[in-house]
């Protein structure tokens, strides 16, 4: 299969508010007041966590049946730790991005614990956002 190209256009609107256009969708991003924004949308690092969780949830939904998993309910808690001083202050030696990302999957199924563990590994391995 040929490479697929995805495109997003992000425009600074006002202050720290950014509207990102993808296909027929617009997503507003902003920062919370504690980081200088007006809290009109999630911030980019929250969007990154949301994208990772959404990607894994989509993989789970797309492949559960073919992997023999009776998927009755599925969600993920995704958390990431970063030091804002990297972005806000340009502090030397402070990593800009996440120092750690934790994903906790929750699954309701009649499948065995062993099959669920294999399925979760499969989901993690097939998510392009987490690659």
Task: Give names to the regions the model predicted.
Residues 1-50, 61-131:
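Extended beta-strand/beta-hairpin segments
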């Amino acid at each position: 299969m040929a490479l697929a190209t995805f495109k997003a256009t992000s425009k600074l609107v006002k202050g720290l508010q950014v509207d990102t256009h993808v296909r027929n969708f617009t997503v507003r991003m902003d920062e919370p007041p504690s980081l200088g924004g007006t809290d009109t949308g999630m911030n980019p690092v929250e969007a990154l966590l949301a994208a990772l969780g959404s990607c894994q949830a989509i993989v789970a939904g797309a492949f559960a049946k073919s992997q023999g998993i009776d998927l009755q309910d599925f969600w993920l808690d995704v958390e990431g730790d970063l030091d804002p001083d990297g972005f806000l202050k340009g502090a030397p030696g402070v990593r800009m991005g996440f120092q750690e990302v934790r994903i906790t999957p929750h699954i309701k199924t009649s499948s065995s614990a062993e099959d669920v563990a294999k399925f979760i590994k499969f989901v993690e391995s097939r998510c392009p956002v987490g690659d």
